[in-house]
Design a protein with these regions (language model features):
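Hinge/cleft segment of the Venus flytrap/periplasmic-binding protein
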Residues: 175-236
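An alpha-beta-alpha
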Residues: 37-85, 182, 187-203
Length: 238
């Protein structure tokens, strides 16, 4: 059997929450230093925590619900916990190893917490109906890490646009293939803006005062490289 040669051609990722964790990079500088780059789907954790405390100032305990098998979810949870600690808010972690455990874990969270936070998490995103079927009758609101989860079980989110980060990854590919950009020096880029969204139906059922339809969006600028902002002023036609 022939030994596989190391892959050296450029690899671009998108919707990766934390490249350092995914690639096992300890000394993170923004660029991987290898043949991998791309765009990141990490939402602004600090602003999400600010949203939670603003909407639910009387919350005593926040539950953080995620799948323990997803390293990116754990990374987000740890960042969110640091924000809660800085604000002196108690929190409890509720982790499910897989979809089979979501119902029991969510039930515990709904019984013990005032608000639940669900980060960007593939397992939770695929099971929002289970979460909603428990949290809605229990009158426990969910702050979501992204739009899809918010649509299924959340009351509000600050979400990135997956279209935008996918588009940017395509632009990065063009820069490499057509312009000769060095992928080892290309920094991982984040979404150029984030969107504040409310789930009108769930807010109404919970009798929350900040009802807003998902089609009405309050777009809030977020971190991005100036290079990306300039490109998106007038997207190129290929």
């Amino acid at each position: 059997r022939r030994r596989r040669q190391p892959v050296t051609f450029p690899i671009l990722g998108t919707s990766v929450t934390d490249y350092a964790t995914a690639l096992g990079i300890e000394d993170w500088t923004g660029a991987t230093g290898v043949n991998i780059s791309g765009t990141c789907d990490l939402a602004p954790i600090s602003e999400q925590e600010d949203m939670l405390t603003e909407l639910f100032p009387d919350a005593k305990t926040v539950g953080i619900l995620y799948c323990s098998a997803e390293s990116n979810s754990k990374y987000q949870a740890e960042l969110f916990e640091k924000e809660l600690e800085a604000d002196g808010i108690e929190y409890k972690e509720y982790t499910a190893a897989d979809s089979n455990e979501i119902q029991s874990v969510t039930q515990s969270a709904a019984e013990e917490c005032d608000v639940i936070y669900v980060p960007t998490d593939n397992t939770m995103a695929a099971n929002t109906q289970i979460i909603n079927n428990i949290c809605l009758p229990a009158k426990v609101p969910v702050i979501a890490g992204e739009q899809g989860i918010c649509s299924g079980c959340g009351v509000a989110t600050l979400s990135i646009s997956y279209y935008d980060i996918g588009y940017r990854a395509g632009e990065m590919a063009y820069e490499i293939l057509a312009e000769g950009a060095d992928i080892t020096a290309m920094e991982i880029e984040s979404a150029p803006e984030v969107t504040k969204m409310y789930n009108a139906q769930i807010c109404e059922e919970l009798a929350l005062p900040f009802r807003m339809t998902m089609s009405h969006r309050d777009r809030i600028g977020w971190r991005s490289s100036q290079k990306w902002q300039n490109k998106n002023d007038g997207r190129k036609e290929r």
